[in-house]
From Swiss-Prot:
Predominant location category: cytoplasm
Species of origin: Chlorobaculum tepidum (strain ATCC 49652 / DSM 12025 / NBRC 103806 / TLS) (Chlorobium tepidum)
Subunit organization: Homodimer.
Keywords: ATP-binding, Coiled coil, Cytoplasm, DNA-binding, Nucleotide-binding
Organism taxonomic ancestry: Bacteria, Pseudomonadati, Chlorobiota, Chlorobiia, Chlorobiales
Ranges for region Disordered: 409-442
Protein name in the entry: Chromosome partition protein Smc
Positions that bind ATP: 32-39
Length: 1183
């Protein structure tokens, strides 16, 4: 069985879908830091069900989804799948290839799939539980887990052992069982509370039944009186209603007549209104037509005015254009004359311009020749000046050097003097600080002695306090256990009392006889007179059967009295067992049968009942199971064999068995059990009181211990010591600093004196060189002055020639400018002539168009004038028709006004009639409402219809006295207060509920006992498996450790179990390699700790190997020699376990059969490159 494939998509840096195929043996995953190697390990841990994002190196779970790069967008989900070859059936499934898939979406949704079938996280965890392959098992080992395994905290080591022992399921089951036990205890407490409440309620209901019967009698009398008085009131209201109905009928007739007249007149008015509306419509249409005609007249007038105005404007435009054409023709003639004159003047101006240019060229040539000679003189002068500057620069540098040497000499002399003064000051300060340092040191020693004494006192008090706390906790746990047991006993006693007091499980007749406590005939029911151990109750229940309900009497007289009581009370029949009539002389032979117990021996009973039990249990034997009963039944056909579960078997072929629920007597031995429990409870109460007293004494002792005072004193002294130590350290540092400064000052003074001598030597050397440079500077400066005078004379001649050249250039430019002006004016005249010609031609075209448009407008004006005259005639005719319609409309409007006035008078009369009718109807409604109220009240109270009762009053019926009697009865009824009228039904219901709760309590007590037994069984089984696994791992650990280190090294695994929880153990690793004696394992080197942890892991693999193991850089702290041992260890286990190693070590890589390189060619995106080592080696050999 091995991990064959893993597929990643969108997980952390794996943006693209990646598949990794693994073979058996060793596989390495390599690559530089930060490329995403460990992301592969995180993916395997995540798909195995890891829920803590911090273990996946992420603050929240959604961060494991690829978050995008500069080029790639973030993904919306991630998916990881692993495929496991289940060839050894380690996983509890029928499939040989198991693929587990987990998806996570960015919105928080997630999916789990098992062989591509959706499932739950619990299914995944259950699949890998106790296989060594879970997300927190030892199949994935990181370097930090090595530290955790070696650390003082043993929780991680304990998890490894639990996984190897396969007790994870047991602990989970035990946890569930504990929760069920707590739930059962809470339910039992609730049932006890409810039982007490229900019993109280049943007693109250008995009183309410009697109260309800008395109230029923009062209600019957109330009903008779109330119905009679209601019938009388009904008759009085009917007599008032009859005349009112006649008045309503008369008013309704008058209303109908007025309504008919109003309707007729209203119809005529509506027809007239319709005619008026028709006239209004015609008026509107006529007005609309008249408005349209007037609008047309107005439009035509406006159009005529526009045409005339436009014609006038066009004529003015033609006149203006003719004037412009004449003016522009005159201007064109003037420009043509000017152009001819300018052309004649251009030739002489051109000749003058040529002569001025020749003179300018001659002067320009003379200036160039003179400037060349001056440039040569300037260069020579500049060269001489640079030579003088270099000499001056050398002189200045030399002078600066000498000045610097003199300044340095003065500075060195001052430094020597300051150093001498500083040395004297330091020596004086050190002498003054020595007494203070000695006093501070002595004070520190005294304070430390006092602090040690306080710490010893504090340790003593803390130890005493811890001892008292431990004793208190033990007492609390003991007291809690005692109180819990006390409550449990109390509940069991209450249950026994409930069963005994309610006579559950007894026939009706026996229960009746048991209730007669005073003067009860006989001894009582058999089930109350015997006692049986809990384990034997089922067997004795089956053996005695119905006999448990027999009623025992001493003699026949007691039995006759009991029969007589039953007959009088009609309580049915009862089986009686009369002790005097049982033949006790004949001895019953109870043969001893091997493998069976006599039933009579399992029953505790008074001596006087032994004859009855011998009779009932003769030849009854109890065996372990039904197989034993069958075998013994063949050998002893005369006997009856009963199993411990209550199954009966006889040789005659009869078998009695099945579920025990409802078929057993719940009273069997309850009385004896109650007496026994009461004795235990009394003794336990004394024990609880003693434990409470002891706890109070411990609390008093604990409160008397004042560790805070000692802590405060110690803290105060520690602060003083700290201040003194700081002061001493400061003084010592000042002393060391002073000594160092004195030594440094001596060294610095020696160096300064040597430097001063060197400065003096240098000053003497530079004096001759200074004098030589000053002489050379003076000679060179004289030569420069001569050359400067010659250059100044040449520059004067150059300036005069340049001025003459500038004047000639001005004269040439003036001649050229005159010539250009004449040329420009001639060109402008020609352009003006062309422009004027174009404008004249355009204006002539405009005049032609305007004259054409004037002719067209004349025709439009004539046509518009004719249309306007016709529109005026039509508008006049429409105005006459509108005046006739308005006259007819005013006449009809007057007539309609008169009709509407008559209608208002009639409607006013009709409204008055309706008001009278409404008043009569209100009075009628009030009477009918009172009648209906009487009927509804009677119907609501008594469920009868009032009109169906006789209306006559009985003779001698006094209405006033009856009303007083009615009020008295109602007051009596109110004095009863709240009465449960369904008390009898509720009483029967609550009684049934009480019986049900009693049975439920028994079930809970039984369940609680069974759960405690289950927890004990789980603890026992899991502890056996854990101890067996621990012993095997311990032997393997010692052997592997000796293989990796030295056989003489001291190594062991120690275990310390807890009395409170046997499965919570402390496992300690003892490892002392190469003769070292470390006080704690944390003191070992990194490599030694890593090999020790690996020894423990592989020791566990020898007991329960994981099909695959992922080692994430666990070889990082190992040197080459230890890496060799590590690889050798892996080779031993590779046949049974597949190893996947994340490593940077070359030796580890070389030992693997396959390599997977993880790179990050694109920033933020991991890429996988597979390499087969064997193929690579073959290619290397071939080459």
């Amino acid at each position: 069985m091995y991990l064959s494939k893993i597929e990643l998509f969108g997980f952390k840096s794996f943006a693209h879908r990646v598949r990794i195929h693994f073979d058996k043996g060793l596989t390495a995953i390599v690559g530089p830091n930060g490329c995403g190697k460990t992301n592969v390990v995180d993916a395997i841990r995540w798909v195995l069900g890891e829920q803590k994002s911090m273990l996946l190196r992420s603050p929240k779970m959604e961060n494991i989804i690829f978050n995008g790069t500069k080029r790639l967008k973030p993904l919306s989900f991630t998916e990881v799948s692993i495929t496991i070859e289940n060839t050894r059936n380690i996983l509890p499934t029928e499939y040989t290839e198991v693929t587990v898939t987990r998806r996570l979406y960015r919105n928080g949704d997630s999916d789990y799939l098992l062989n591509m079938v959706p499932c739950r996280l619990k299914d995944i965890l259950d699949l890998f539980a106790d296989t060594g392959m879970g997300s927190d098992a030892y199949s994935v080992i990181e370097l930090k887990m090595i530290e955790e395994i070696i650390s003082n905290k043993s929780e991680e080591r304990l998890k490894l052992f639990e996984e190897a022992a396969g007790i994870t399921r047991y602990k989970q089951r035990r946890k569930q069982t504990f929760r069920q036990l707590e739930s059962a205890s809470r339910d039992l407490a609730r049932v006890d509370d409810v039982l007490a409440e229900v019993e109280k309620k049943v007693r109250n209901l008995r009183l309410q039944v009697r109260k309800a019967e008395r109230l029923k009698e009062i209600r019957e009398e109330l009903r008779t009186l109330d119905l009679t008085l209601s019938a009388i009131s009904m008759d009085e209201h009917l007599q008032k209603l009859r005349p009112l109905l006649d008045s309503i009928a008369a008013e309704e007739r008058q209303c109908h007549e007025l309504a008919a007249t109003i309707a007729k007149l209203d119809s005529a008015h509506q027809e007239s209104e319709l005619r008026q509306l028709e006239l209004e419509r015609k008026l509107a249409d006529a007005q609309k037509e008249l408005n349209a005609s007037n609008q047309l007249v107005h439009t035509l007038e406006k159009q005529l005015l526009q045409h005339k105005e436009k014609q006038k404007n066009l004529l003015q435009t033609i006149e203006r254009l003719n004037y412009s054409i004449a003016d522009k023709g005159r201007k064109r003639l003037e420009q043509e004359a000017l152009s001819k004159e300018l052309s004649e003047k251009q030739t002489p101006l051109q000749e003058v311009c040529t002569a001025q240019l020749a003179e300018f060229e001659r002067l320009k040539k003379q200036e160039v020749e003179l400037n060349s000679a001056l440039d040569a003189s300037r260069q020579a002068l500049q060269s001489e000046r640079r030579a003088v500057a270099e000499l001056q620069k050398s002189l200045n540098a030399l002078n600066l050097t000498r000045q610097s040497l003199r300044t340095r000499k003065e500075h060195l002399e001052g430094s020597v003097n300051r150093l001498d003064q500083r040395k004297r000051d330091l020596e004086r300060s050190m002498e003054q600080a020595e007494p203070e340092r000695r006093r501070t040191s002595e004070a520190i020693e005294e304070k430390k002695i006092a602090l040690d004494e306080l710490k010893k006192e504090e340790e003593r008090l803390v130890a005493l306090k811890a001892s008292i706390t431990e004793q208190s906790e033990k007492k609390k746990e003991e007291l809690l256990s005692l109180k819990s047991e006390h409550n449990h006993l109390n509940n069991r006693i209450a249950l026994c009392n409930s069963i005994l007091e309610k006579f559950e499980g007894l026939p009706e007749g026996v229960a009746f006889l048991e209730k007669q406590r005073a003067g009860k005939p006989g001894l009582g029911c058999l089930s109350d007179l015997i006692s049986v151990r809990e384990n034997d109750k089922k067997a004795i229940n089956a053996a005695l059967g119905e006999s448990l309900g027999y009623y025992l009497c001493r003699n026949l007289e007691e039995a006759r009295l009991a029969v007589s009581s039953l007959a009088k009370a009609d309580k049915g029949k009862v089986h009686f067992l009369i002790l005097d009539l049982i033949d006790g002389g004949a001895k019953i032979d109870y043969a001893e049968i091997e493998g069976a117990r006599r039933a009579i021996d399992l029953v505790e009973t008074p001596a006087e009942l032994s004859k009855a039990l011998n009779l009932l249990l003769q030849h009854c034997y109890v065996v372990a199971d039904l197989d034993a009963a069958e075998q013994l039944g063949k050998k002893h056909p005369e006997a009856l064999f009963i199993t411990e579960k209550g199954e009966k078997f006889t040789r005659r072929g009869m078998l009695y068995g099945g579920s025990a629920k409802g078929g057993e007597s719940v009273r069997l031995g309850k009385k004896a059990e109650r007496d026994r429990l009461q004795k235990q409870m009394a003794g336990m109460a004394e024990t609880i009181a003693e434990a409470e007293n002891a706890l109070a004494v411990l609390r008093k002792e604990f409160s008397a211990i004042d560790t805070e005072r000692v802590k405060r004193a110690a803290a105060s002294i520690s602060q003083e010591i700290s201040a003194l130590e700081k002061r001493l350290a400061r003084l010592e540092a000042e002393e060391r600093s002073g000594a160092d400064q004195i030594a440094h000052a001596d060294r610095e003074r020696t160096a300064l004196i040597a430097s001063m001598q060197s400065v003096l030597d240098e000053l003497e050397k530079t004096q001759p060189e200074t004098l030589r440079i000053e002489a050379e500077i003076e000679t060179a400066q004289q030569k420069v002055n001569v050359m400067q005078e010659e250059l100044s004379a040449g520059e004067s001649r150059s300036r005069a020639l340049h001025a003459e050249l500038q004047a000639q250039q001005g004269r040439y430019r003036d001649a050229q400018l005159d010539l250009e002006k004449h040329r420009f004016r001639a060109s402008a005249c020609q352009q003006t002539i062309v422009t004027l010609s174009d404008e004249i031609e355009g204006m002539q075209h405009q005049i032609a168009r305007a004259e054409k448009e004037v002719a067209e407008l004349g025709q439009s004006i004539a046509q518009a004038t004719a249309e306007h005259e016709q529109a005026v005639v039509v508008s006049a005719r429409q105005q006459e028709a509108l005046n006739e319609l308005e006259s007819s409309y005013r006449d009809l409007q007057t007539k309609n006004h008169d009709t509407l006035s008559n209608l208002r008078d009639l409607r006013r009369k009709h409204d008055l009639s309706q008001q009278m009718l409404a008043e009569f109807n209100n009075r009628k409604a009030k009477l009918e409402q009172e009648i209906a109220h009487l009927q509804a009240t009677v119907m609501e109270r008594y469920g009868v219809e009032l009109e169906m009762m006789p209306a006559h009053v009985p003779e001698g019926f006094d209405v006033a006295a009856s009303r007083e009697r009615l009020a008295y009865l109602q007051k009596q009824k109110e004095q009863f207060g709240g009465v449960n009228e369904l008390a009898l039904e509720e009483y029967e219901s609550e009684k049934e509920r009480l019986d049900f709760l009693t049975a439920q309590k028994e079930d809970l007590v039984s369940a609680e006992k069974q759960l405690r037994e289950t927890i004990e069984e789980i603890n026992r089984t899991a502890l056996e498996k854990f101890r067996e696994t621990f012993n095997q791992v311990r032997k393997n650990f010692i052997r592997i450790f000796h293989d990796l280190f030295d056989p003489e090294d001291e190594v062991d695994l120690l275990i310390t179990t807890s009395d409170e929880d046997p499965l919570e153990a402390h496992i300690q690793i003892v490892a002392k390699p190469r003769g070292k004696k470390p006080l704690a394992i944390e003191q070992l080197s990194g490599g030694e700790k890593a090999l020790t942890a690996l020894s423990l892991l592989f020791a566990i693999y020898l007991v329960k190997p994981s099909p695959f193991c992922i080692l994430d850089e666990v070889d990082a702290p190992l040197d080459d020699a230890n890496v060799g041992r590590f690889i050798k260890l892996l080779k031993k286990f590779e046949n049974n376990t597949q190893f996947i190693i994340v490593t940077h070590n070359k030796k580890s890589m070389a030992s693997c059969q396959a390599l997977y390189g993880v790179t990050m060619e694109e920033e933020g995106v991991s890429k996988l490159i597979p390499v087969k080592i064997e193929n690579a080696r073959s290619e290397e050999t071939a080459s």
